[in-house]
Amino acid sequence: MIKMPRGTQDILPQDSAKWRYIENRLHTLMELYNYKEIRTPIFESTELFARGVGDSTDVVQKEMYTFKDKGDRSLTLRPEGTAAVVRSYIEHKMQGEPNQPIKLYYNGPMFRYERKQKGRYRQFNQFGVEAIGAENPSIDAEILAMVMHIYESFGLKHLKLVINSIGDSESRKEYNEALVKHFEPVIDTFCSDCQSRLHTNPMRILDCKIDRDKEAVKNAPRITDYLNNDSKSYYEQVKLHLDNLNISYVEDPNLVRGLDYYTHTAFELMIDNPEYDGAITTLCGGGRYNGLLQLLDGPDETGIGFALSIERLLMALDEEGISLDVSEDFDLFVVTMGEDADRYAVKLINDLRRNGIKVDKDYLNRKIKGQMKQADRLNAKYTVVIGDQELENNEIGVKNMISGESENVQLDELVNYFKSRKEV
């Protein structure tokens, strides 16, 4: 038997309704904030992620699904969404549009070759938001407010917003030099990844899952001590907006995020529930990226965004015992007796569906009792039984499955009968 690839999942019908519910809620919330949907290819040029995400990141070095096409071009299944959205922004010259900043959101599968664990898949679904074309603390605050709005709208509690500033390029240069000086004497005691990052991306040592509890990490210089005046001012204004919005947050000077393009504001939304086992601690993450557009040969413009995992959102809802109202009303089940009735029912249900009525029938030649059980399984509001007598009399009994009451209706009026009930 051929099975699904390791690190993937089948979303079965009983679960796909939850996915649709979440995605519809997210689409609705985006309309409130005036964000428009963008759809980019599932695969892109490998160079896009090597340059945009960063050569020294785990994503580029270890996790990308890269292949050569028949034209010997190197392509990669997208591991994240921001680089592709920025590429599209540049390619289609959106910077020339009058409605700046350009507010975009996306939703779709991403691919990373990660070790299988709870809450992580090699194909995972990511919903993300990007606001490009404005460097203003208020748009950072809007993004953070949106993150809280999304998760609170599902009824989640135990949320902890963690923020930091990693400054501009000047601040980061000074900070990286301080980190190299701090870690160099003890780097031999760190993992091989940290050793390779020391001179390429020393900030990532602070984020290492293996060594982050070491004393050298706990005592490392703090980015906030190296922020220049502009970076400090920007960060303080973001926090003032959050205070004004009554959004609680925790500052973590070691929060650096895993991708190279972040500047200034960086953040994660965590689940802060002591009953969790820690496997799905981070629900969402993002930040500002002021140099990414130029890095990809675009204009000197800035952006900010975030991404969340639908899988982790579903797990968090399950952990907190929050059920989604995904019950689906089904209008009518047609029970048939005999070939003539079945032939009539095929045309009838086609007419009903063309008029917006959710309707189904039996296709396995079940007896009446079996067909009625199928109607119950579908939670059909109504059933009708069509046999030779009903066809001869041009009249049918419509049974309300909730009240148990029945009403006789002319067969040729059945479509109008159900249309009138849908419109109420």
Curated annotation (Swiss-Prot):
Protein localization: Cytoplasm
A Pfam family hit: tRNA-synt_His
InterPro entries: aa-tRNA-synth_II (IPR006195), aa-tRNA-synth_II/BPL/LPL (IPR045864), Anticodon-bd (IPR004154), Anticodon-bd_dom_sf (IPR036621), His-tRNA-ligase (IPR015807), HisRS-like_core (IPR041715), HisRS/HisZ (IPR004516), HisRS_anticodon (IPR033656)
Gene Ontology biological process terms, A to Z: histidyl-tRNA aminoacylation
EC number: 6.1.1.21
Protein biosynthesis in keyword set: yes
Superkingdom of origin organism: Bacteria
Keywords in alphabetical order: Aminoacyl-tRNA synthetase, ATP-binding, Cytoplasm, Ligase, Nucleotide-binding, Protein biosynthesis
The reaction(s) this protein catalyses: tRNA(His) + L-histidine + ATP = L-histidyl-tRNA(His) + AMP + diphosphate + H(+)
CDD domains the UniProt entry points to: HisRS-like_core (cd00773), HisRS_anticodon (cd00859)
Alphabetized GO MF terms: ATP binding; catalytic activity, acting on a protein; histidine-tRNA ligase activity; transferase activity
Gene Ontology, cellular component aspect: cytoplasm
Cysteine pairings via disulfide bonds: none
Primary enzyme class: ligase
HAMAP family (alphabetical): His_tRNA_synth
NCBIfam families, alphabetized: hisS
PANTHER family cross-referenced by the UniProt entry: HISTIDINE--TRNA LIGASE, MITOCHONDRIAL-RELATED (PTHR43707:SF1), HISTIDYL-TRNA SYNTHETASE (PTHR43707)
Subunit-level organization: Homodimer.
Family of this protein: Belongs to the class-II aminoacyl-tRNA synthetase family.
Name of the molecule in the record: Histidine--tRNA ligase
